[in-house]
Amino acid sequence: QGGPVSQSTIPEHLQSFIRAVRNSTRTAPNVVLIGESRDAETLRGMIESAETGVAAYSTVHTRSVPETLSRIINVFPVEERLQVTVTLLSSLRLVVNQRLVPMLGGKGRVALREFLAFTPEIREVLLDTPPERLIQTCETLLIKYGQRMQDAAQAA
């Protein structure tokens, strides 16, 4: 009998992250958490999970919110990127970029976070943006509606 949390370890229980994502859809989860998404198949599975209403969380190693979008989209073959972009932007709700940096005085670290909530209005703007301007537009939206890393550093 399953409890409220089901965990699978790679490669002990399943061979890959994509198999974990696909396997999770059989259990009708509310939430899927994948440690790291770095290939097209894992990202495709995460996006598909989000499309079905599952809260899908993962890490993508990047240095900014716009770079995160770029990394996710550019992992896919060129011929798939437009459709992936539309699907991603339709299901995306929040991107957070975090860095741990030394505190002034050198005692400990502080988490600096850059984030942008993908509200319906922001998603609409990005969906109406030509693909070649998507990252630049995301940067503009981040400055206007999100929190940039520089702002987090100044507040810390």
Please provide the spans of the model-predicted regions.
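Short, flexible helix-loop junctions that flank or precede catalytic/ligand sites
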Residues: 1-156
